Amino acid sequence: MTFILAATLTLNAPEFSQAHLGIGYLEWLTNSIFVAAVVSLGVLLLARGATRQMSLVPSGSQNLFEALVEGLYDMLEGIVGKHMVQKSFALLATLFIFILVSNWFALLPGVGSIGWGEKTSFFNTDVEVPLLRPSTADLNMTLAMAVFFMFMWLVWTLQEVGIKGFLEHMFGVKGGVKGLIGFLLVPIFFFVGLIEVISILFRPVSLSLRLFGNVFAGENLLTTMITIGKQLGFPEWVAALASITVPIPFYFLELLIGLLQALVFTLLCAVYLQLSTAHDEEDH
């Protein structure tokens, strides 16, 4: 197996396998962790550059970042409320921006097409282990984000309603029913509470698998479109031309899907938070 550069312009062989790039104390550094660090550093540098010389009348990159932040804030405030958005906005906005940039970073030429593999011909290369792997196409990364959010969800929920309020919300009789009827409904609502506990435990799994599955499926879709000429048995020069032109419409589709998946992940997190922290007497 040799280190090779794929001739195609994009992803060529998405893999579950990880490439460990570090040695010694950096042995834990994988291709997806490296990409996550690059994306995080890039976002920080862009944000720093946009806010270095801020003015009352924004322009250029400052205007773009302010529009993004204000739009996210207004959207999340409409879901979690004025009080909770002050606590949760930093995390939810960070998740949205990181997932969005990571999804779009995966579409850059060289991500997934440079790595270790075997060269089959001048135009076709089988990359078995890519040097750069999209972080959101790594289940470890998506699961880590989901688990960390659920931890903060539990912290914020207990801060808002307390342990007693949390248990009442999970297992208590709903609708203000009291007396004999309320007593008879206790076993039913306790069973419903157990089902709710199970659903909460599966939330990080569903969040992580949904994001991972869509991003990974997008990689495979682009791979199929790139290699379709070869798979159909076209001449090598036709297959090479098809590998460049056929995937173009799907690039725009993946740009849209990358945005939608970032929105879905963030909005689901906001909805989970709103459901557990909303007070009936408050206006949300």
Regions found by a protein language model. Give the residues of each.
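Selective transmembrane helix interface/packing segments
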Residues: 1-284
